[in-house]
Every structure is written in structure tokens, then in C-alpha cells.
Amino acid sequence: MTLDAPEPIAAYLAAEEAKDADAVSRCFTEDGTVHDEGRDYRGRDAIRQWKQAADEKYRYVLQMVNAQTHGNEVTVRARLTGEFPGSPVELDHIFKLSNNKIASLEIRS
């Protein structure tokens, strides 16, 4: 996955590709948040659990489509292909950064 992105997002994408929930959670601030499928996950432990559950439930591959940066916010468009209804699907991953970490991630269609 090649993408010119700030370091915390590049690290997140590498951890995502490796399916490493621990590494994903370390990309976030201590009180970082993820909003996905109508639910919020706050803190690294909750983010780790969310990532593990998503990887087990959906078994997907993420392919980057494009990215746009606006200040401390980066929107990454990704195509997810896998074992879930409606596959493939394109989703926006909206990252907000703080102190070289991800403060929040919102995933939406």
C-alpha cells in the first residue's frame, strides 16, 4: 500500500495491512477515538478490541484509492474487498491528528 501520508497514518495503514491490532492501537493518542458502524471506541484498549473484532468478522483487504489533507485532517478513500455483504465497498477514513498521533478516526461510506 503506497500513500504519501503523515507518519501516524502511514503507520496505521501498515498495521492495518499486517492485521496487527496492537500496532493499530499504538498509532492513536491515549484517549483516541474510532467511530465505525455507528459506534464509538475510546482509548487504546477499546481500539485494539474494535480492530481485532473487525478483522475476525469481515476478513477483508484494504486498497487505498486516494487521500486529501486539510490541516490536521486527512481523508483516505479506501476500497475494502472481503467476506461481507456488498463487497467491495469504498469507505472514507477521516483521520484527525494531534502530537504525531491519531486523535480520531471516523469511517464512513
Question: Residue spans of the language-model regions?
Answer:
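Flexible, active-site-adjacent loop/turn segments at secondary-structure boundaries
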Residues: R26, R39, G82
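A short gly/proline-enriched turn/hairpin at secondary-structure junctions
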Residues: D31-R42
